[in-house]
């Protein structure tokens, strides 16, 4: 149908077939060009322009019936995707001064829609006498030579503006963005562009910020630059790092209506990073604002070739700082709308978020006329609007890394001569970062190193900023960029570092050698043992027991001579409740008895090599005698417990639970009947008097001992 309509237009008389297309929506123009092959049937080649008579010379922009027919033909060719043929007709019309910028609307719209389908146009030769065009062409010529020296790993690019990271700020969710990109999106409903978590929940206030809140002020949480990453980027990529700063400075000047000054910043930035597509796309916008259309189109072509498959969305954005995000996604609309830019350039500050949302709604493709073409509607079906990211809605597509450059171009490059593994060493353990975590103050440590420091003091080990909120939340997310950087460029060092960590975890998970010992009180098998953990060494011990997966440690009585008793009980952690100041309450229960073979220490807490002990089983007449003794002592213990006062009995029940039932076979459990240990825990005995019962390997001796204790207590009560 489209082909038939085009052929009919080409066959109409000049008076009827004038260019009467409806005006396209503002901003629906392009920063990219598509010269790829198309499947449509080829239309007839544009007819050559007749030679003009000298007396027929007209003023620029004057339309004749002949020029209207050719303009209609050029627009039709552009709509069909035959861009080269259309440009040839436009060029001839321009040479005859029968073409004005407003008549290129159809071409620009088609360029914006057709770019992702194929290759970009070859660079156009600079016009004679055009100094600016010559400068652009010279930059393109030198770009290939400088690209190898400035090619940047895709991981070093901001996932919000898709440019080289400038003043990188790592959020507590683990993702890193440019500081200015985050400052532009710090409203209460803003979210991380990758994981969708609210920024207000990520930006943890430091001690100074909390102090100002107590004074009645409400300052925004400070954004601190990632010290390690910022220093590394400046060392490895001084050119792109400086170019990124110049880009942000140019954006600021552009918003302040200092367009010429912004152009100078971008010219300098392009020299430092000639393969950064954002620089060309943004400079194309500046050229178009200055009505230097040839330079604008030329820069747009270069941006297209640097990132041919990265152009997706088609949304009009209100200012240059946001246009670079659109250019990173391939938004050509914001790059070629001088009227829009001039209108927004009159403002001296960034617009409020609600105003931007209203503007986006008014200028979105859905609000525009349906006559702007089927390409717009088709594109809206296959892309997500960028406003989701800036208005607080997580964009699923943004979670994926942006596509790397196509072709034979290397996906990453790093100046290994200047790269040193010591640049990625933890300041606490002096080893390569393993599971790096960045604090709100901008310092990076290994996760385990940071946790150990917070066990002692809730402050940053380097700058002493308060980290109590981090300690309270206990949600540490690994820094994504730094993990990927180490895995990509230091694989051998990371392998060795991981090996050390795994060996340490394997050693810690051994429940026979170097078992962690909590020196505190008596513990018994099957009996609950709640613990209040506040000492730094035991915080570390409990955390390691959980991390290794064993969730077990030994409990022993203290000994003034040996350090701790020779016998103890293994406790298993059932639950841990953490407090904001780092303390915790551990719900544990006794599992097995052990004897200490060798004592030692590790990182401030006691450890021991142990052997597990069990009751010796009996058979025959001894077994029958044991059964009778077991039934008798159980009845005696039950009578004593029920004779206690109600208040005391309730306290025992709340702490230890109800008395266990009598076992049908007292030798079924290697540690003996559960009710025996429950009774020993509630009997009013000193810990030293209870310890021999834990060491006994004869159930008969243990039952006789309990019977004697009950008899002694009953006599004293009477």
UniProtKB/Swiss-Prot annotation:
GO terms for cellular component: cytoplasm. InterPro entries: Lon_prtase_N, Lon_prtase_N_sf, PUA-like_sf, TPR-like_helical_dom_sf, TPR_rpt, Znf_C3HC4_RING-type, Znf_RING, Znf_RING/FYVE/PHD. Signal peptide: none annotated. Residues 505-714 form the Lon N-terminal domain. Keywords: Metal-binding, Repeat, TPR repeat, Zinc, Zinc-finger. Disulfide bonds: none annotated. TPR repeats lie at residues 67-100, 243-276, 278-310. Pfam families: LON_substr_bdg, zf-C3HC4, zf-C3HC4_2. One of its GO terms (molecular function) is ubiquitin protein ligase activity. Gene3D superfamilies: LON domain-like (2.30.130.40), Tetratricopeptide repeat domain (1.25.40.10), Zinc/RING finger domain, C3HC4 (zinc finger) (3.30.40.10). Transmembrane segments: none annotated. Residues 57-66 have a biased composition (Polar residues). PROSITE patterns: LON_N, TPR, TPR_REGION, ZF_RING_1, ZF_RING_2. Residues 1-69, 322-413 are annotated as: Disordered. It comes from the Eukaryota. Residues 339-352 have a biased composition (Basic and acidic residues). A zinc finger (RING-type) spans 158-196, 426-464. This is LON peptidase N-terminal domain and RING finger protein 3. The lineage of its organism: Eukaryota, Metazoa, Chordata, Craniata, Vertebrata. The gene is LONRF3.
